[in-house]
Amino acid sequence: MAAALQVLRHLARAPSGPLLWGGPLARMASSMALAEQARQLFESTVGAVLPGPLLQRALSLDPDSGELKVRDRSFQLRQNLYLVGFGKAVLGMAAAAEELLGQHLVQGVISVPKGIRAAMEHAGKQEMLLKPHSRIQVFEGAEDNLPDRDALRAALAIRQLAEGLTADDLLLVLISGGGSALLPAPIPPVTLEEKQTLTKLLAARGATIQELNTIRKALSQLKGGGLAQAAYPAQVVSLILSDVVGDPVEVIASGPTVASIHSVQDCLYILNRYGLRTALPRSVKTVLARADSDPHGPHTCGHVLNVILGSNALALAEAQKQAEALGYRAVVLSTAIQGDVKSVAQFYGLLARVAGAHLALPGAGASVQEDERLYELAADLQLPDLQLKEALEAVVGAPGPVCLLAGGEPTVRLQGSGKGGRNQELALRVGVELGQWPLGTVDVLFLSGGTDGQDGPTEAAGAWVRPELTSQAAAEGLDVATFLAHNDSHTFFCRFQGGAHLLHTGLTGTNVTDAHFLFLHPQ
């Protein structure tokens, strides 16, 4: 067994040669080798956006003069540096900042996911942990990525620190994905429970992250520029690890250091769109009604410097580099994959069919109808940075295997009470799509994973699939359609082939949305 694994690892490191020699055993070896490559590539992708190296590149401190440089801006430190943070990656960001800034840091407060310190310690990731006698106070909360009382206490502690600052002080704000849930501070009389219920209803009806954040900001003391306002007149530097498509700073963690550009009318439009305006609690109506006469958040944030440290684009650039080193012709399709997960899955499924046809039949390719349908699906998704033409041209000109890379956050409309996440649901739906298309002599594998290591309320980061998924599942007595109808993708993957198709990384300490890999290897 050990010898067989060594052979497979060798194959995973040498994809430029043929992986298939014919026969079921060879095909199984190819499948395992591709899966190993996919896992390695995902690890490299995540490694490119870990908080420590990112902070070290963004910050530099002159130990003699106490001058802190943030990109091209300079700040003088003289026992006037404070720190707050919130998000899934903030523990590691704070540890890196503490290591760099040392005794210059006076005080800090961070809000991080429940159990993350124990998880990092258990995983041996000491670089993600604060020093034993740290000046940074840590609050853990937002279990299952939902705002709760513990996160509320953290938010109030952050607000208290910010409100105590003066014009001589500098506030370093660390922000990453998951920050919205970890910084809940509703505007009275709205309660945490009321705000949470409204957010859940919107999410269940398919609201986008941008729409959710618009509502959150309107009902929050700290989001939508509220934290920047609380810290005024202190200087504020926000270091942001983006988990939002396109990296809009006003959307990431609901923009606590960016003045909100949305009006009450924007909120009412969203609530109308999802049929919730007439069902609003009285407290929410009260806050929205007075917002026009008493605008929340500062009109400007001239005292704030917002810096994007890392993003999905940075992660995929590393994935492309690593895939090419493995012998693939690699193309980044898009860093802005959005839309309904069903539509995204259909696009990936047909993309595999069309690209696979070009690889299997050079000079012939897919039918005109299939090509046209692929471009129609792409147009429906409205992806601003989609490189579909470039990807297909690369496939046509490729002498060997191809890896198509993408990132973003598809939306899952909840219809059942199953357990899953958008990455596992996307992978399962793509598996179904792959099984519907004849892929000929091309070996195909699709992987979808969350860079934070947690896909929904599960312990998996995502999953990978192959065209044989539906038939193999049926042989095990598993009906894929039933699991999808109940949004129960995690349960499916746990049962299917003993969970072998699940992607397990543990909490990574970073978060730059999701990564999607489509591997196409000619036999």
Swiss-Prot record:
GO terms for biological process: protein phosphorylation. SUPFAM superfamilies: GckA/TtuD-like. Pfam families: DUF4147, MOFRL. The gene is GLYCTK. The modification N6-acetyllysine is found at residue 200. One of its GO terms (cellular component) is cytosol. It comes from the Eukaryota. It is found in: Cytoplasm. Its EC number is 2.7.1.31. It catalyses: (R)-glycerate + ATP = (2R)-3-phosphoglycerate + ADP + H(+). Belongs to the glycerate kinase type-2 family. This is Glycerate kinase. The modification Phosphoserine is found at residue 60. GO terms for molecular function: ATP binding; glycerate kinase activity. Keywords: Acetylation, ATP-binding, Cytoplasm, Kinase, Nucleotide-binding, Phosphoprotein, Transferase.
